[in-house]
Regions:
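Strongly charged
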Residues: 1-33, 37-40, 44-158
């Protein structure tokens, strides 16, 4: 069987409250065990907490995702038996996916003593990312440092 056909990309429907596709992707990614309504409730609660700080929740969310999105990454490339970490630019869709994944992971890793619910953790992480701080921003900076350190191997890109 030949593999000539292109796979059609599935589009995500925008979320019901803010009518935003990026937020819908975020909700889907934060979902556990297929419980979307629980995920929606927690994300919207986190955005309400951001709103209580007299900030526009959608602007904070979008800025946080953009701030965390990496521009460069390293990819392994085998050349003559040796494997090199070759820095390359991150394409648009992968940037957003990594950003969403890191924000959710950073929120889940926050302390349960200080932040009792996932909504508390997520609100804190979104505000930190909005202000260019927090664990997700550290992860992005680590990736950029790694790409910078392996700049010597950038000629292996093809």
């Amino acid at each position: 069987m030949s593999r000539t056909g292109k796979i059609k990309r599935r589009t995500v429907e925008s979320d019901p409250i803010f009518a935003n596709r990026l937020l819908a992707r975020f909700i889907n990614r934060s979902m556990r065990d297929g419980k979307k309504s629980v995920s929606q409730r927690m994300v919207y609660k986190a955005l309400d907490m951001v709103k209580e700080k007299n900030l526009d929740p959608l602007v904070v969310f979008q800025s946080a995702v953009q701030n965390v999105a990496p521009r460069m990454e390293v990819r392994p490339r085998r050349v003559g038996g040796a494997s090199y970490q070759v820095p390359s630019e991150v394409r648009g869709d992968r940037r957003i996916s990594l950003s969403i994944r890191w924000l959710i992971q950073a929120a889940r890793n926050r302390s349960n003593k200080q932040y009792h619910t996932f909504a508390d953790k997520l609100a804190a992480e979104l505000l930190d990312a909005y202000n260019n701080a927090g664990e997700a921003i550290r992860k992005r900076d680590l990736m950029h440092r790694n790409a910078e350190a392996n700049k010597a191997f950038s000629h292996f890109r093809w």
